[in-house]
Amino acid sequence: MPGLERRLRAELTGEVQFDRFSRGRYATDASHYQVMPIGVVAPRTIEEADRAIAIARGEGASVLARGGGTSQAGQTVGKSLVVDCSKYLSRILDLDVKRARCTVEPGIVLDDLNRQLKTHGLWFPVDISTSSRATIGGMAGNNSCGGRSMRYGTMRDNVISIEALLADGTLAHFGRIGGNLKDVPTPLRPLAKDLLAIGAREADEITARFPKVQRRVGGYNLDALVPGKNDINLAHVLIGSEGTLAFSTRIELKLSPLLGRRAVGVCHFGSFSEAMNSAQHIVRLKPIAVELM
């Protein structure tokens, strides 16, 4: 797509790569899949990412957001224009220590985020094993869990709001909404109305069929649209969607106090089945994590 490459190089200051070697580096991730992308762009700002997506839309090219490439099911490979968020879109945009929350760009790496939060006695507790490379944007797209999800939950439980670009270029704020759609920002209001209608119409089906498990990371979070005791948070619809619904530009996170003293308990069992059967009783003690070795 020569027109796509020409426009990207002319209108962006970020890195634009269309040579075979560069594209080959983005043709795979932590999975065994390999798909050569159309090209790669590493925007220097969110505004440049917006522009790159607009150019791709005008040239008829699909867009694939990419973070650290740690996905194990091929989520970050495809015949698309890859937008690499990890190289430059990695800042903390706002930090509110008193309210224990921060807003970040999608390409910030989890370990880098926690390194900066540590001086304030805070951390982001979705501590996945690839924390040295995984980005917050990718973790949100994947609804990552981490080894301490029994205590802290998944990404869905720790994301407050998301600002994202829709396919038509609309920049919208996805967050908690009450019963009055007038409180929803104008660009998102028609879409919010449709989403709430889906939740209300399919509430019984969703309630009956969605698995009642905490670490559910497959499929769209349609259950987030079902009316209940708490306000609906539209950001939860984007979480776990693998970037198929929108391109995240700002992610507001709920932070937790740093862990204090910790202790490790080791239990020995005579068989694998005995260990598995005991897990349900151990969980009732509310440990931070349980691991089978």
Predicted regions and their residues:
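N-terminal flexible segment immediately upstream of the FAD-binding catalytic core
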Residues: 1-58, 68-100, 129, 152, ...
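Non-catalytic terminal accessory/regulatory regions of metabolic enzymes
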Residues: 3-10, 15, 271, 284-293
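A generic structural signal for well-ordered alpha-helical segments
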Residues: 8-9, 56, 63, 117, ...
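A glycine-rich phosphate-binding loop feature that marks nucleotide/adenosyl-phosphate handling sites
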Residues: 22-25, 71-74, 130-137, 219, ...
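Preference for bulky hydrophobic residues occupying beta-strand positions
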Residues: 41, 83, 162-164, 267, ...
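Hydrophobic faces of well-ordered beta-strands that scaffold small-molecule active sites
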Residues: 63, 265, 288-290
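FAD-binding subdomain of flavoenzyme oxidoreductases
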Residues: 92-93, 104-286
